[in-house]
């Protein structure tokens, strides 16, 4: 993306001046502060989050990538780092990572288990090889599947009419 880079092994965060300039359009200091807080919520999550085991790496496995970026945006969503429901992308799939997955993970927290985000992060050490479906079953029970929960979420937020 054009606004930051991932946290590297030394936990540095690079914040693009181009993104700062865009966020400060119309000299709106409040918007700039809000966006900077959101970026920090996302990027600092990378410094502390756990990584899926047994499935490759960020650059080699889309599941790994979707988990990493989805969790970082879930922390941002959960802490008011986006402009509420209006910032939620419509449709898509949890494998899209970032906000699409982030809003879904927070919905799981709000509707299935208040400790979901913490448990989901921890699942990367307990479900090996890690998968979305394996983590869901580990946290919520064998009767749940990631795809069924995604469908339930899409209906609940009005993206799918039944």
Language-model region placement:
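Short, small-residue-biased leader/transition segments that mark boundaries at the very start
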Residues: 2-9
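Glycine-rich, acidic and aromatic/proline-enriched surface loops and short helix-turn segments
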Residues: 50, 73-81, 110, 114
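Surface-exposed cleft-lining segments at the edges of enzyme active sites
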Residues: 50, 54-59, 91, 120
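Post-HExxH zinc-binding segment in Zn-dependent metallohydrolases
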Residues: 59-102
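Solvent-exposed loop/turn segments at secondary-structure junctions
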Residues: 19-22, 47, 54-55, 79-82, ...
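Short pre-active-site segment immediately N-terminal to the catalytic Zn-binding motif
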Residues: 19-40, 55-64
């Amino acid at each position: 993306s054009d606004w930051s880079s991932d946290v590297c092994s030394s936990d540095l965060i690079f914040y693009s001046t181009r993104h700062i300039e865009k966020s400060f359009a119309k000299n709106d200091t409040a918007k700039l502060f809000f966006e900077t807080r959101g970026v920090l919520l996302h990027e600092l999550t990378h410094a502390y989050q756990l990584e899926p085991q047994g499935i490759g790496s960020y650059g080699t496995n889309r599941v790994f990538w979707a988990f990493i970026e989805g969790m970082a945006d879930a922390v941002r969503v959960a802490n008011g780092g986006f402009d509420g429901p209006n910032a939620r992308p419509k449709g898509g799939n949890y494998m899209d990572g970032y906000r699409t997955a982030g809003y879904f993970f927070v919905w799981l927290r709000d509707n299935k288990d208040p400790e979901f985000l913490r448990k989901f992060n921890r699942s990367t050490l307990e479900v090996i090889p890690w998968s979305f479906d394996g983590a869901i079953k580990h946290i919520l029970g064998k009767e749940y599947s990631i795809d069924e929960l995604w469908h339930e979420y899409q209906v609940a937020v009005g993206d799918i009419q039944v």
